[in-house]
């Protein structure tokens, strides 16, 4: 279909087809938010073309911004012409990633000084713009050249032979080293063990002034103004990239897809490690060894371990720069990026990072944007940029979960044992500073286990605890109780990050996790043999048959220190922004320490502070008050900077029938509170309602219940009373599985049943899917057309108010957020909002496109309360009908589906 060029308010928005009116409104409002540097909360129901509205609206703004910038640059750089002051200021504040340089002058400063400073600022601006111009021209020429001659593939073939020769030389060198040549030998180590020893550590203070930073700043070019788009899953990001390709901007946009090493790594040895943390550490370790080998080392004698380390064959700067250019030439998804990296023998993970500065649109998953350390490691610079966070209905929970972490007693004891054995093994080779930090970490681990009531010298699985239960503490109280308040956790965290101790420890367990005959015979290694036995006792899962004598036993325990690092980092959070939950169970191994983040705004504040504009978008964003109060206001965003936009649905008003039913067929009032929902009469009334609905609704009926446990109880009761048999007459019954791996299988069977019923004349008219609010079926699954002709919500899924985490969060909000006169406490509002967000996300599964139709049935009289109605999505709220009794409700459902399924009979 030919592209449409829509003009809205004097702005041209290219669009692949005539947009809906709500899409026009969406794009116009989005353009205003980006132009004005605002924070926008956008709600556009699924099925209304939200992705295309975001793409065409945002990229239209970027197109116009770049044009204005080029025009202003030309004006400023024209010989003999000076731009007006306002234009100069505009350039200064909007130039890519540059902080405004205009600073207020001191009062009473002489005019000639002020004039001199202003002229210098103008000269600096002109110089910077000239440099940007040169870089832009070089980039355009480079991309044009790559497009014309296909250098990348040619270069890959040319260098392959050279790399094979290099690898052969490396093998020869390793064989020579394994023979034990060289004057420096403190003691004989096992083959390949040298790289496990920590290098000499320098703190930040010692490094200061000698630029030994790991970041390769000299390789980075200036970041142009761009849009960062992030979503929850890789499948959602892939779908977004496909939408960009289909849009009028698909051929001209420089788009980069970012992902984790788990997604983009092409080195099979690294991929086989499995864990993302292990892959990250191994990758960085290989880069370090490459830098060590490339260094001159003339001023220092090279240590043996530096010579035997291997580097990644895909980490080749020349090849990665060529891969970067290929990425920028045309839009590519993750699969294409990986395939191109393999063909070019260049790392897609780093190739995509190299492409960030020149990219116009960067597509990335949530953690890469919302976690500061990950963001920094990826080379993402937010200063002056635009961020769009899609599928953001759970944004607050996502930030909280990313920065909350838990470690159990087994992990703490295992890490202590591993680290102690490591220190004893390499004590003579470790420098004093390394030993100091290792002893501090051992002390921390010992004290954390003691807080749980255990002893690191004993097996955690057999240490029983006399006192059990959960205890919630402030960060400072926890540190005092643990007797570790005198340790600088910031320095320990930095040491772990820079020394890569976790990675060394993992290599150590890999090396000595295999029982070799020599180990049991050697006096030196008896301690390690005991260490192996301890590790075996901590392994989870079924016990395998014992191997025959002399046979190696393969143990691959990943060092839990990697996991504990995140917990230590969390403990550096400000005291008021987090809590530590000490959870004591039957044994030390089952007990745990959990860090709970209370204030997600502390991590979101940097994003909104640095960015030019931020857009938070989703299909169901109601209630929006959480975003305003918990996230934006607490991040220091002024109310005047926040813009809210919510549009209706594209479906005709008569294609949806939302009903609130207050009582059932036997006049039993529907109130599914925690105290009443398990009563036999309530469970039976629910079954009777579903039986009636299934008799008149064609295709699929999706029924959401508050929890898996309640679903199990209801299903068992219906089976016992015969209600399940009555339901099965019209609908085949499916249940949502707890295991995520089984969801796809159940969905396929559910869909297949409905399709087969639509082509048959039997009694079976479709299927009933019993699902759980907050489960896999309530998010990301589309029940379009016959798959979801009726969505039933049983009760109101309030969260467990007895949860210590939730109680602490409520107390925190009551203490920190202002309370409006006559309104409930912020903590009470939180409970209601969590419930309504889950409901809105679930009932939004039914309507997926303009010609779709469905009935939405809310079973609970509490839905009729004005405060609850106000938090439903506007497109549902405006059409909802409250039915006090079941008879009129049933008649309305029957009439609706008869008219929609058989319009010719009406």
Curated annotation (Swiss-Prot):
Keywords: 4Fe-4S, Activator, ATP-binding, Cytoplasm, Cytoskeleton, Developmental protein, DNA damage, DNA repair, DNA replication, DNA-binding, Helicase, Hydrolase, Iron, Iron-sulfur, Isomerase, Metal-binding, Nucleotide-binding, Nucleus, Phosphoprotein, RNA-binding, Transcription, Transcription regulation. GO terms for biological process: cellular response to bleomycin; cellular response to cisplatin; cellular response to hydroxyurea; DNA damage response; DNA repair; negative regulation of protein binding; nucleolar chromatin organization; positive regulation of chromatin binding. It comes from the Eukaryota. Disruption phenotype: Embryonic death at 10.5 dpc. Embryos are smaller in size, malformed and exhibit sparse cellularity in comparison to normal or heterozygous litter mates. Show inability to form a proper embryonic placenta. Display high incidence of cell aneuploidy due to abnormal chromosomal segregation. Show abnormal formation and localization of heterochromatin. A motif (DEAH box) lies at residues 390-393. GO terms for cellular component: centrosome; chromatin; cytoplasm; extracellular exosome; midbody; nucleolus; nucleoplasm; spindle pole. PROSITE patterns: HELICASE_ATP_BIND_2. One of its GO terms (molecular function) is 4 iron, 4 sulfur cluster binding. Pfam families: DEAD_2, Helicase_C_2. The keyword Nucleotide-binding applies. Residues 9-442 form the Helicase ATP-binding domain. Its cofactor is [4Fe-4S] cluster. Associates with the CTF18-RFC complex. Associates with a cohesin complex composed of RAD21, SMC1 proteins and SMC3. Interacts with CHTF18. Interacts with DSCC1. Interacts with FEN1; this interaction is direct and increases flap endonuclease activity of FEN1. Interacts with PCNA. Interacts with POLR1A and UBTF. Interacts with RAD21, SMC1 proteins and SMC3. Interacts with RFC2. Interacts with TIMELESS; this interaction increases recruitment of both proteins onto chromatin in response to replication stress induction by hydroxyurea. This is ATP-dependent DNA helicase DDX11. It comes from Mus musculus.
